[in-house]
Amino acid sequence: MDKLKGLINGLILVGMLSSAQSPATATTAPQKPVLQSLNEPQTPATHRTLSIKGYKTLSGTKILFIRTPGLPMFDALVSFAAGSAHTPHNPGLAAVTYSLLNEGVAGKDVNAIQATFDNLGARMDMGISQDRIWISLRSLSDESRRTPALELFAQVLGKPLLPQESLPTVKSQLQYFLDHEEQSHAAQAQIANLGQLFPDHGYAQSLYGTRAGLTAITRTQVQDFHREAYAAGNAQITLVGDLTEEEAQRIGAQISAALPLGPATAAIQPVTSPAAPGLLRIERPSTQAYLRLAQPSVLQNSPDYVGLQMAMRIFTNRLTHELRERRGLTYHVDADLSALQAQGLLTIKLQTRPEQADAVLAHIKTMFSDFLAQGPTQQELEDSQQRLAGSAPLNSATNMQILRQLHAISAHNLPLDLDFATQAALKLNLISIKTALNRHYHADQWRAVILGPKTDQQPLPAPGESATNAMCRVPGEIVAS
């Protein structure tokens, strides 16, 4: 089990869990596999036509299933609308509840749970975001291994002890995450930018809560939140692997029946009054400046989402060519859409030299204004579509990749087709992309953050002038010139 590794993934802080519940902000080395047959072989990807089956239990649990009989194994992922943005008035409650889930069930503590899964050749993983939490199980399909693994998995989900004795440890670990978050320039720039877009909203809070909020949380609050947010009506189950349709239905019903009875939680409300466009400067000692620009966008199930996503791929390529390749001002720049469920978000982020942060910000705004006015070129669109068509089979090469896509389809109410977004993107034309861009974005609506040292500003170097002083990548968050 992987437990609470604090990660920043685009606009969503994701916590991955390990059995010891030990926090880290960097990816840890892969563990030695407990069972070789659970490792999917690295074979060249080929396109697979995969049929999605959908069901719903009487208690309201949504189930999606894809059969992949190539390997004698399966993956189950259970997701709840129980992320940090669901508890804005009790900061940290979602993270504390999530962290206590596998601390014990009847007759087993956290170590015994881990040992049982290991002995069965199974693996449990967990994750949390602002919107949702998820818990997954990978197991062999053989019934003698599958049955006890699923029984324990369902017990962890539906009847965790949420022990009082583990509460101080969990709070301490989340406090550690908050400490690290405050020391991370990238995290602070992100939180500040989210605060501009989502003032007084759960999305603007740290995934881990606040110090005062964590201190105040009681076991009774945790138990109440588990009973409400981890209810069958608030659950979504995705299954992928070597199972028959009857077995998948039975597994889904088994997991759903183990959960508390209850309806779906209230949806997170979208932001109605974001802060006015503008620039927020945060002075911090650093060898670089952290830049973030954001403005409202569309939800993932919007008809325009695919076109805007393609547009941002193209614009990212333009930014990379201009800022990295021609001027040597950054190692990496990215323009991307968020996967938040209540409010879409377009974000551009990069790191650059402090003395040229203002000039870089102005240049990005000018480039985006030109992009809105002119749209992409035919060559840019064809190149992006060709790359997408070539990489699409890689997205369904393994069960885990399929599971991730299936989870996104379930969470965002997307069409029941793994190829839907790819096929829609391949049908895009210049007019549809430019129309979508100008329908949703404005050149003067950026909320921007520059975090870094105060210094005299310099103009942009001419293309090619900074080749010998270009930004370079070194370990950690350090990007030196």
Name every feature range the model reports, one short phrase each.
Residues 34-53, 196-235, 267-271, 392, ...:
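Histidine-acidic residue clusters that define the catalytic metal-binding segment
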